[in-house]
Amino acid sequence: NFTNTMSEINDKIEISGTKTWIDGGKTHNNATEITLVLTRTSTKPGSVEETVVATPTWDGNTYTFNDLAKYDTEGYLYEYKVVENAIDGYTTVQDGRNFINTISDINEKINVIGTKTWIDGGREHDNTTEITLVLTRTSTKPGSVEETVEVTPTWNGSTYTFSNLTKYDAEGYLYTYKVAENPIDGYTTKVNG
């Protein structure tokens, strides 16, 4: 009896991918914060997916599973798949073997609220026409530049509200908002807060 075994049956491969965080530049230790699960299925008809017990190595934001069998014991190719366990506070998008984790509330909206006080002997004022408020924001990302936000506040008596403002920039850095008032003839302006 003869058995012919292909010479490549013991070949090994590696599986790699990347990890991207969109959360305002927070520092992460991928090796301890992320759980990647590696599975494989033989291309032999009727094969069932099985979990591979393996720990990836990390080089920055690139992971690699090393020394993986390329073929099963009968010479059928293995197909490998990597999934990431959910991380609290993040939404994960998988693109092939690459993962992008974005803070879950990146699309959260906020309001900026303040009040206008007139010290002028009780004169009547229409804040919606007499006052021009300018809203600016700066990302907390180092090197960011202040930008004007084109939005008009709503007024309820002496209280103004800038509504539905973006809390984070596209990279997950918090925005800091600031309100200024254009000068009004005959008045000096003092900002509190």
How would you describe each model-predicted region?
Residues 1-193:
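Solvent-exposed loop/turn and edge beta-strand elements of beta-rich ligand-binding domains
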